[in-house]
């Protein structure tokens, strides 16, 4: 396996590397796995293994030219994430073999589904790169929306049918609710999903407003298609409360109602715009903007990039010692490269202490370090905060006392995918569980993992 263009200043190019390749082939190598780029930094690695927001299959033309000059089969991997692109590369004679590493991490049954002519059921790779970054942050190549990858021993890729069919309600159509409904339907249960809004996807619908993260739509689209295939009754524009659910004859209710932006509880916090409103376009802001990130995910990075691209002068502030502490190296490097080019200023180790509104309509933001009395200030046209979410748990809270399990999740069963059999209230007519951000502020992967673990036990 070797690169045929290091794509860097003073790096080796196709001519030199073809000579190296020919020497290797003369030494007895039977197949060449040809790549583009180099791997000596996170940023350069994203050129070899492009991530979300970057072009698909960017090196096909280069590798096609290389193939014509070699007398052994040539394989290539480089964000060839879908079957049509792979098929084209083979049929057009550009490649002899296609490497689809991340696509197989997302769906190990991809080859089987091609053979069975069920390509429409392939779980798509969305390029989030949780798999690659996860090797270094979590010690395993997890997939953002396949919770079984990396956990096959306790959470197999296949879902066993339930011994007895049940009538189950899922409340909420975000990532957690969609995965819950899919898992329950795969087990053979009768499933009804209630979503208060007019579309499925939850917070993904906000995230995809950033051009860099549009591929996340694949998480929603695949599950929506699977729910249709599996016969799940999806009810949009359907707000349901505890009384609606408790009297509907369900055997189990899974609450996946998500969360709402967490309020910034500081003096003058009412002057802060919520990140969701700005990302969704509901609120517009220009001029000098301070973004306060006390969450550490990609949300503040999306905010900074979008606002800076629209002409705002942006300062991104975090109380942490590093920016975006929960974002992996490959993803972070792509954002930081863009933000640096846009002139975004980065400030670490600063808490947003208080805010004052000035007579001219601007705001003074007072920053300081944790437990320190001194302050420094910024005068800006607007302040946006990203602080995670607060669980929306009203429906769950009201159902707990009516349920047979008292809302309890058996931890050992959760870990190993066993049945949830806890009985705390013998008079209860149904079980109730909550998953995803309805428990606490986390992310897409955690929400889907919750759903997979809990619902396999129902």
Language model segments and positions:
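Short beta-alpha connecting loops at secondary-structure transitions
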Residues: 45-52, 96-97, 204-212, 433-440
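Generic beta-strand/beta-sheet core signal
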Residues: 1-3, 34-37, 77, 92, ...
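Rossmann-like dinucleotide/flavin-binding elements
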Residues: 162-196, 200, 236-249, 256-329, ...
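Rossmann-like dinucleotide-binding cores of NAD(P)H-dependent redox enzymes
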Residues: 190-230, 297-352
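Local beta-strand N-terminus motif with an aromatic residue
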Residues: 29, 95, 250-251, 380-381
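Flavin-dependent oxidoreductase catalytic cores
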Residues: 1-171, 175, 179-186, 190-191, ...
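A structural motif corresponding to the C-terminal end of an alpha-helix
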Residues: 26-30, 65-73, 223-235, 342-345, ...
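Short, hydrophobic/aromatic-rich segments at coil-to-beta transitions
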Residues: 359-365
């Amino acid at each position: 396996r070797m690169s045929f263009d290091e794509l860097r200043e003073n790096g080796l190019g196709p001519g030199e590397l073809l000579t190296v390749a020919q020497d290797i082939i003369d030494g007895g190598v039977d197949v060449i796995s040809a790549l583009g780029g180099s791997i000596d930094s996170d940023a350069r690695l994203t050129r070899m293994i492009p991530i979300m927001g970057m072009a698909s299959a960017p090196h096909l033309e280069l590798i096609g030219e290389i193939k014509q000059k070699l007398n052994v089969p040539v394989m290539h991997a480089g964000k060839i994430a879908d079957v049509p692109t792979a098929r084209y590369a083979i049929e057009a004679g550009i490649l002899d073999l296609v490497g689809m590493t991340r696509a197989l991490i997302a769906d190990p049954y991809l080859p089987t589904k091609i053979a069975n002519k069920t390509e429409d059921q392939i779980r798509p790779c969305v390029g989030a790169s949780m798999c690659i970054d996860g090797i270094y942050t979590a010690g395993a190549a997890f997939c953002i929306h396949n919770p079984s990858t990396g956990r096959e021993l306790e959470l197999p890729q296949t879902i066993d049918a339930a011994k007895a069919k049940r009538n189950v309600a899922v409340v909420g159509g975000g990532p957690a609710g969609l995965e819950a409904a899919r898992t329950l339907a795969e087990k053979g249960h009768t499933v009804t999903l209630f979503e208060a809004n007019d579309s499925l996807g939850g917070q993904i619908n906000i995230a995809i407003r950033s051009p860099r993260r549009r591929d996340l739509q694949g998480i929603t689209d695949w599950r929506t298609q699977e729910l249709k295939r599996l016969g799940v009754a999806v009810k949009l524009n359907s707000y349901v409360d505890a009384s609606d659910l408790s009297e509907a004859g369900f055997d189990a209710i899974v609450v996946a109602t998500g969360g709402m932006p967490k309020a910034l509880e500081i003096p003058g916090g009412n002057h802060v715009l919520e990140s969701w409103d700005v990302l969704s376009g509901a609120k517009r802001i220009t001029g000098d903007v301070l973004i306060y990130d006390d969450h550490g995910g990609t949300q503040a990075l999306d905010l900074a990039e979008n606002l800076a691209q629209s002409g705002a002068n942006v300062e991104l502030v975090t109380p942490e010692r590093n920016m975006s502490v929960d974002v992996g190296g490959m993803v972070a490097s792509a954002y930081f490269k863009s933000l640096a080019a846009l002139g975004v200023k980065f400030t670490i180790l600063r808490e947003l202490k208080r805010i004052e509104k000035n007579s001219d309509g601007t705001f003074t933001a007072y920053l300081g370090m944790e437990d320190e009395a001194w302050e420094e200030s910024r005068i800006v046209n607007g302040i946006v905060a990203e602080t995670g979410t607060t669980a929306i748990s009203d429906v769950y809270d009201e159902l707990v006392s009516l349920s047979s399990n008292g809302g309890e999740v058996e931890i050992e069963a959760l870990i190993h995918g066993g049945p949830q059999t806890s009985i705390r209230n013998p008079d209860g007519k149904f079980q109730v569980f909550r998953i995803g951000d309805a428990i606490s502020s986390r992310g897409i992967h955690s929400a889907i993992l919750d759903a997979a673990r809990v619902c396999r036990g129902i």
